[in-house]
Protein backbone atom coordinates (compact mmCIF):
# COMPACT_ATOMS: atom_id res chain seq x y z
CA UNK A 1 0.00 0.00 0.00
CA UNK A 2 1.14 3.58 -0.59
CA UNK A 3 0.57 5.10 2.85
CA UNK A 4 -1.86 3.19 4.98
CA UNK A 5 -4.54 3.43 6.02
CA UNK A 6 -5.74 6.54 4.14
CA UNK A 7 -8.35 7.32 6.80
CA UNK A 8 -5.69 7.34 9.50
CA UNK A 9 -3.40 9.50 7.38
CA UNK A 10 -6.24 11.92 6.70
CA UNK A 11 -6.77 12.26 10.46
CA UNK A 12 -3.09 13.03 10.99
CA UNK A 13 -3.11 15.49 8.11
CA UNK A 14 -6.20 17.23 9.43
CA UNK A 15 -4.47 17.64 12.78
CA UNK A 16 -1.66 19.37 10.91
CA UNK A 17 -4.10 21.59 9.03
CA UNK A 18 -3.96 19.61 5.77
CA UNK A 19 -7.38 18.52 4.56
CA UNK A 20 -6.96 18.57 0.79
CA UNK A 21 -4.32 18.11 -1.87
CA UNK A 22 -2.14 20.91 -3.17
CA UNK A 23 -3.81 20.53 -6.56
CA UNK A 24 -7.28 20.93 -5.10
CA UNK A 25 -6.22 23.95 -3.06
CA UNK A 26 -4.88 25.50 -6.27
CA UNK A 27 -8.17 24.79 -8.04
CA UNK A 28 -6.58 22.54 -10.66
CA UNK A 29 -9.32 19.92 -10.34
CA UNK A 30 -11.83 22.52 -11.52
CA UNK A 31 -10.15 22.77 -14.93
CA UNK A 32 -12.55 21.13 -17.37
CA UNK A 33 -11.36 18.49 -19.80
CA UNK A 34 -13.11 16.48 -22.50
CA UNK A 35 -12.72 13.21 -20.59
CA UNK A 36 -14.11 14.56 -17.33
CA UNK A 37 -11.17 13.24 -15.33
CA UNK A 38 -10.96 13.44 -11.57
CA UNK A 39 -7.20 14.02 -11.74
CA UNK A 40 -5.89 17.56 -11.40
CA UNK A 41 -3.16 16.83 -13.94
CA UNK A 42 -2.85 14.20 -16.66
CA UNK A 43 -0.80 13.34 -19.71
CA UNK A 44 -1.03 10.61 -22.36
CA UNK A 45 1.81 10.19 -24.85
CA UNK A 46 2.43 7.76 -27.69
CA UNK A 47 5.68 6.19 -26.56
CA UNK A 48 7.06 5.66 -30.06
CA UNK A 49 6.03 8.79 -31.94
CA UNK A 50 6.14 11.11 -28.94
CA UNK A 51 2.75 12.51 -29.93
CA UNK A 52 0.79 14.03 -27.06
CA UNK A 53 -2.69 12.53 -27.17
CA UNK A 54 -4.10 14.19 -24.07
CA UNK A 55 -2.96 16.76 -21.55
CA UNK A 56 -4.38 18.54 -18.56
CA UNK A 57 -2.35 20.89 -16.36
CA UNK A 58 0.72 18.94 -17.44
CA UNK A 59 3.09 21.74 -16.35
CA UNK A 60 1.71 22.04 -12.80
CA UNK A 61 4.31 21.25 -10.12
CA UNK A 62 2.71 18.95 -7.54
CA UNK A 63 3.69 16.51 -4.79
CA UNK A 64 4.07 13.03 -6.28
CA UNK A 65 3.99 10.73 -3.24
CA UNK A 66 5.21 7.20 -3.95
CA UNK A 67 5.79 7.87 -7.65
CA UNK A 68 9.12 8.92 -6.14
CA UNK A 69 9.96 5.23 -5.73
CA UNK A 70 10.23 4.89 -9.50
CA UNK A 71 13.32 7.11 -9.41
CA UNK A 72 14.59 5.29 -6.32
CA UNK A 73 14.39 2.01 -8.22
CA UNK A 74 16.00 3.47 -11.34
CA UNK A 75 18.99 4.74 -9.36
CA UNK A 76 19.35 1.41 -7.54
CA UNK A 77 19.20 -0.70 -10.69
CA UNK A 78 21.63 1.54 -12.56
CA UNK A 79 24.09 1.70 -9.66
CA UNK A 80 25.32 -1.85 -10.14
CA UNK A 81 24.78 -2.69 -6.48
CA UNK A 82 24.35 -6.47 -6.03
CA UNK A 83 20.68 -7.36 -5.77
CA UNK A 84 21.50 -10.45 -3.73
CA UNK A 85 23.19 -8.40 -1.00
CA UNK A 86 21.31 -8.66 2.29
CA UNK A 87 20.06 -5.47 3.93
CA UNK A 88 18.35 -5.20 7.30
CA UNK A 89 15.42 -2.95 8.18
CA UNK A 90 16.47 -0.52 10.90
CA UNK A 91 14.80 2.11 13.07
CA UNK A 92 15.98 4.67 10.52
CA UNK A 93 13.59 3.12 7.99
CA UNK A 94 10.52 3.60 10.20
CA UNK A 95 8.22 6.39 8.99
CA UNK A 96 8.16 9.01 11.71
CA UNK A 97 6.46 11.61 9.51
CA UNK A 98 3.17 9.95 8.56
CA UNK A 99 3.37 6.81 10.68
CA UNK A 100 2.57 4.59 7.71
CA UNK A 101 2.32 0.93 8.56
CA UNK A 102 4.69 -1.78 7.41
CA UNK A 103 4.93 -5.51 7.91
CA UNK A 104 8.71 -5.33 7.59
CA UNK A 105 9.65 -5.26 11.25
CA UNK A 106 12.83 -3.62 12.44
CA UNK A 107 15.50 -6.31 12.28
CA UNK A 108 14.00 -8.05 9.24
CA UNK A 109 16.66 -9.00 6.70
CA UNK A 110 16.01 -9.31 2.99
CA UNK A 111 18.13 -8.92 -0.09
CA UNK A 112 18.22 -5.73 -2.12
CA UNK A 113 16.27 -7.34 -4.95
CA UNK A 114 13.40 -8.25 -2.62
CA UNK A 115 13.35 -4.72 -1.21
CA UNK A 116 13.24 -3.35 -4.74
CA UNK A 117 10.40 -5.71 -5.63
CA UNK A 118 8.28 -4.68 -2.63
CA UNK A 119 8.97 -0.97 -3.15
CA UNK A 120 7.75 -1.11 -6.74
CA UNK A 121 4.80 -3.51 -6.59
CA UNK A 122 3.31 -2.71 -3.19
CA UNK A 123 4.93 0.66 -2.46
CA UNK A 124 6.62 -0.62 0.72
CA UNK A 125 8.03 2.46 2.45
CA UNK A 126 10.54 0.77 4.73
CA UNK A 127 11.86 -1.24 1.79
CA UNK A 128 12.30 1.93 -0.29
CA UNK A 129 14.01 3.82 2.52
CA UNK A 130 16.32 0.87 3.18
CA UNK A 131 17.34 0.89 -0.48
CA UNK A 132 18.54 4.47 -0.15
CA UNK A 133 20.02 4.08 3.32
CA UNK A 134 22.02 0.98 2.36
CA UNK A 135 23.63 2.69 -0.61
CA UNK A 136 27.41 2.80 0.00
CA UNK A 137 27.36 6.54 -0.69
CA UNK A 138 24.89 7.18 2.16
CA UNK A 139 21.26 8.23 1.91
CA UNK A 140 22.06 11.92 1.38
CA UNK A 141 24.22 11.16 -1.62
CA UNK A 142 21.63 8.66 -2.83
CA UNK A 143 18.99 11.40 -2.95
CA UNK A 144 21.47 13.64 -4.75
CA UNK A 145 21.90 10.85 -7.30
CA UNK A 146 18.12 10.79 -7.75
CA UNK A 147 18.17 14.51 -8.54
CA UNK A 148 21.13 14.15 -10.89
CA UNK A 149 19.28 11.44 -12.77
CA UNK A 150 16.21 13.67 -12.99
CA UNK A 151 18.34 16.44 -14.48
CA UNK A 152 19.93 14.00 -16.95
CA UNK A 153 16.45 12.92 -18.10
CA UNK A 154 15.42 16.54 -18.67
CA UNK A 155 13.07 16.67 -15.67
CA UNK A 156 13.51 20.42 -15.21
CA UNK A 157 10.70 20.92 -12.69
CA UNK A 158 11.36 17.97 -10.40
CA UNK A 159 12.97 17.68 -6.98
CA UNK A 160 13.45 14.65 -4.73
CA UNK A 161 14.14 14.84 -0.99
CA UNK A 162 13.77 11.19 0.07
CA UNK A 163 13.56 7.70 -1.48
CA UNK A 164 9.97 7.01 -0.36
CA UNK A 165 7.80 9.95 -1.42
CA UNK A 166 6.49 10.43 2.11
CA UNK A 167 7.55 14.08 2.11
CA UNK A 168 5.33 16.47 0.18
CA UNK A 169 8.54 18.18 -0.96
CA UNK A 170 9.07 15.42 -3.53
CA UNK A 171 7.54 17.28 -6.48
CA UNK A 172 7.26 17.01 -10.23
CA UNK A 173 4.97 17.60 -13.19
CA UNK A 174 3.08 15.26 -15.48
CA UNK A 175 5.46 16.30 -18.26
CA UNK A 176 8.53 15.39 -16.22
CA UNK A 177 7.04 12.14 -14.97
CA UNK A 178 6.43 11.00 -18.53
CA UNK A 179 10.21 11.22 -19.03
CA UNK A 180 10.85 9.15 -15.91
CA UNK A 181 8.23 6.58 -16.89
CA UNK A 182 9.71 6.30 -20.37
CA UNK A 183 13.18 5.70 -18.93
CA UNK A 184 11.93 3.18 -16.39
CA UNK A 185 9.98 1.31 -19.06
CA UNK A 186 13.29 0.48 -20.73
CA UNK A 187 14.40 -1.35 -17.57
CA UNK A 188 13.08 -4.94 -17.79
CA UNK A 189 13.54 -5.67 -14.08
CA UNK A 190 11.54 -2.61 -13.06
CA UNK A 191 8.80 -3.61 -15.47
CA UNK A 192 8.68 -7.13 -14.05
CA UNK A 193 8.75 -6.08 -10.41
CA UNK A 194 6.22 -3.25 -10.75
CA UNK A 195 3.63 -5.43 -12.50
CA UNK A 196 3.77 -8.54 -10.29
CA UNK A 197 0.18 -9.15 -9.12
CA UNK A 198 1.17 -10.91 -5.88
CA UNK A 199 4.40 -11.82 -4.14
CA UNK A 200 5.41 -13.83 -1.08
CA UNK A 201 8.43 -12.94 1.00
CA UNK A 202 9.94 -15.55 3.30
CA UNK A 203 11.12 -13.07 5.91
CA UNK A 204 14.11 -13.64 8.15
CA UNK A 205 11.69 -13.46 11.10
CA UNK A 206 10.20 -16.77 9.98
CA UNK A 207 7.03 -15.18 8.66
CA UNK A 208 5.73 -15.60 5.13
CA UNK A 209 4.55 -12.14 4.11
CA UNK A 210 2.06 -11.90 1.24
CA UNK A 211 1.94 -8.69 -0.76
CA UNK A 212 -0.49 -7.50 -3.42
CA UNK A 213 0.12 -4.98 -6.16
CA UNK A 214 -1.03 -1.49 -5.18
CA UNK A 215 -2.53 -0.98 -8.66
CA UNK A 216 -5.84 -2.80 -9.04
CA UNK A 217 -5.60 -2.61 -12.84
CA UNK A 218 -2.74 -5.13 -12.80
CA UNK A 219 -5.18 -7.96 -12.11
CA UNK A 220 -7.60 -6.78 -14.80
CA UNK A 221 -7.16 -8.95 -17.93
CA UNK A 222 -8.41 -6.08 -20.10
CA UNK A 223 -5.22 -4.16 -19.37
CA UNK A 224 -1.74 -4.75 -20.82
CA UNK A 225 0.60 -2.89 -18.46
CA UNK A 226 4.36 -3.26 -18.79
CA UNK A 227 5.35 -0.84 -16.00
CA UNK A 228 3.43 1.08 -13.36
CA UNK A 229 3.67 2.93 -10.07
CA UNK A 230 1.00 4.26 -7.76
CA UNK A 231 1.23 6.98 -5.14
CA UNK A 232 -0.81 8.61 -2.40
CA UNK A 233 -0.38 11.13 0.38
CA UNK A 234 -3.00 13.72 1.28
CA UNK A 235 -1.05 16.56 -0.33
CA UNK A 236 -0.58 14.65 -3.60
CA UNK A 237 -3.95 12.95 -3.95
CA UNK A 238 -4.08 9.61 -5.75
CA UNK A 239 -1.41 9.30 -8.45
CA UNK A 240 -0.49 6.78 -11.14
CA UNK A 241 2.02 6.38 -13.95
CA UNK A 242 1.95 3.53 -16.47
CA UNK A 243 3.49 2.24 -19.63
CA UNK A 244 0.62 0.38 -21.25
CA UNK A 245 -0.56 -0.89 -24.60
CA UNK A 246 -3.98 0.34 -25.76
CA UNK A 247 -5.42 -0.51 -29.16
CA UNK A 248 -2.01 -1.70 -30.30
CA UNK A 249 -0.21 1.49 -29.28
CA UNK A 250 2.40 1.76 -26.52
CA UNK A 251 1.38 4.69 -24.36
CA UNK A 252 2.69 6.57 -21.35
CA UNK A 253 -0.08 7.58 -18.94
CA UNK A 254 0.39 10.01 -16.05
CA UNK A 255 -2.38 10.85 -13.57
CA UNK A 256 -1.77 13.21 -10.65
CA UNK A 257 -4.07 14.15 -7.79
CA UNK A 258 -7.15 12.06 -8.54
CA UNK A 259 -9.88 12.39 -5.94
CA UNK A 260 -9.76 8.80 -4.67
CA UNK A 261 -8.35 5.34 -5.25
CA UNK A 262 -11.41 4.40 -7.30
CA UNK A 263 -11.30 7.70 -9.17
CA UNK A 264 -7.69 7.04 -10.15
CA UNK A 265 -8.65 3.72 -11.74
CA UNK A 266 -11.78 5.24 -13.29
CA UNK A 267 -9.67 7.97 -14.91
CA UNK A 268 -7.40 5.31 -16.40
CA UNK A 269 -10.43 3.46 -17.75
CA UNK A 270 -11.79 6.66 -19.32
CA UNK A 271 -8.47 7.24 -21.04
CA UNK A 272 -8.37 3.65 -22.26
CA UNK A 273 -11.87 3.83 -23.75
CA UNK A 274 -11.19 7.18 -25.38
CA UNK A 275 -7.89 6.09 -26.96
CA UNK A 276 -9.48 2.87 -28.23
CA UNK A 277 -12.37 4.78 -29.80
CA UNK A 278 -10.04 7.32 -31.41
CA UNK A 279 -7.81 4.57 -32.81
CA UNK A 280 -10.87 2.85 -34.23
CA UNK A 281 -11.84 6.03 -36.06
CA UNK A 282 -8.27 6.43 -37.34
CA UNK A 283 -8.21 2.83 -38.59
CA UNK A 284 -11.46 3.39 -40.47
CA UNK A 285 -9.78 5.85 -42.75
CA UNK A 286 -9.28 9.20 -41.09
CA UNK A 287 -5.66 8.31 -40.33
CA UNK A 288 -3.20 9.65 -37.81
CA UNK A 289 -3.18 9.60 -34.05
CA UNK A 290 -6.06 10.67 -31.82
CA UNK A 291 -6.43 14.42 -31.74
CA UNK A 292 -4.64 16.33 -29.02
CA UNK A 293 -7.13 17.23 -26.28
CA UNK A 294 -5.88 20.00 -24.03
CA UNK A 295 -7.39 20.48 -20.63
For the regions a language model picked out, list residue spans one by one.
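Polycationic, low-complexity disordered segments in secreted or periplasmic proteins
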Residues: 1-2, 292
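Active-site-adjacent loops and short helices of periplasmic peptidoglycan-processing enzymes
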Residues: 2-175, 179-188, 246
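Domain-terminus/edge residues, biased toward the C-terminal soluble/receptor-binding domains
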Residues: 155-159, 165-295
Amino acid sequence: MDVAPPAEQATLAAAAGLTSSFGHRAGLHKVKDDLNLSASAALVIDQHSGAVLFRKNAEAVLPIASLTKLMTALVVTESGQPLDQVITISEDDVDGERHSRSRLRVGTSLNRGEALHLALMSSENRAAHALGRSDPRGIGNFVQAMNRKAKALGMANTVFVDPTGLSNRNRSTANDLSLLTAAASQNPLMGEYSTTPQHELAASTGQVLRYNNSNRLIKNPQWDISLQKTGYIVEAGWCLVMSTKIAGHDLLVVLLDAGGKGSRSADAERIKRWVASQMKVANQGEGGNPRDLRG
